[in-house]
Amino acid sequence: MVEPKYPGLVEEYVNLGACYDREGLQGVRDGLMGCMKGYKGCYQRAYRCLTAAAQIGEDVRALLLTPAVEAKMSKRARGILSREIKKGDGDAGRAVRRFLGAVTWKGALCNFETVEALCRRVYELSDPYGMAHPMLSQLAAGALAAGHDAILCPSPLYPDRLEHLLLPGLSLAFVTGTPALPWPKRPYRRIRVDAMADAELLHRSRARLKFSRKVSAALVDEAVDSLAQAKAMHDELEKLYNPHVDFGRVYETAEEIISSLTAQM
């Protein structure tokens, strides 16, 4: 549940609890309470694992993302902007944030199909160490300043960091490719972000980086397993709840909300 910041002014509460058959639910009380407790515990374990994996990634990034690397990224971004991003006629572009990927019960996923549907030209930023954010931020800022709308796609593990950038008006995208989730097609251009790192530092840190990668992958796998368990328990919850929900009333409420939103567009 998301609490509205300005109830009645910008947002409003939607009470779907009125759609329950409360008397009928009493007959499955014990089963509901058991499933509810179990699946919440699985989610908590998954979140702890993902938090730990993110902290390991932060440690790797702090090691490799030196000022010299950021300078190389900035120079490369300036070259791309001068070549690909032409100044528009109007005001600054509009930015929206959308997650393109997630860690789910099926594993780590990314909807690259969305990129293909919106953009013909795709730059793949090959980035096994999670360093591409400064470059993507500079590209996004340049595109917006030139008057182009942008879709900023944050990382699921690091929501304050960009992982992908889509510029549909230019049919141009910049996607981060990793060993776990590489861009599945032949890219328009490929940029090896890892090649910008200090070679001597990479060599000295090889064992540390290998260990970090192994532990991080294990933590994500454990999180995925916990999410799969949570989904199984949630599916059982739905089996218990569904016979006691007035779905006609649910759909009627949904249509009312859709009509209200459509009228405001």
Question: Where on the chain are the PLM-derived regions?
Answer:
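Conserved nucleotide-sensing/catalytic segment adjacent to the nucleotide-binding pocket
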Residues: 1-43, 142-221
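An accessory alpha-helical subdomain
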Residues: 31-89, 208-257
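N-terminal pre-Walker A segment at the start of P-loop NTPase domains
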Residues: 79-114
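A broad, low-specificity signal for short, low-complexity segments enriched in glycine/proline
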Residues: 84-87, 132-138, 155
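N-terminal low-complexity, Ser/Thr/acidic repeat segments characteristic of secreted
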Residues: 90, 121, 255, 259-265
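Accessory recognition modules or surfaces
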Residues: 106-113, 119, 167-172
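Glycine-rich phosphate-binding P-loop
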Residues: 109-110, 119-143
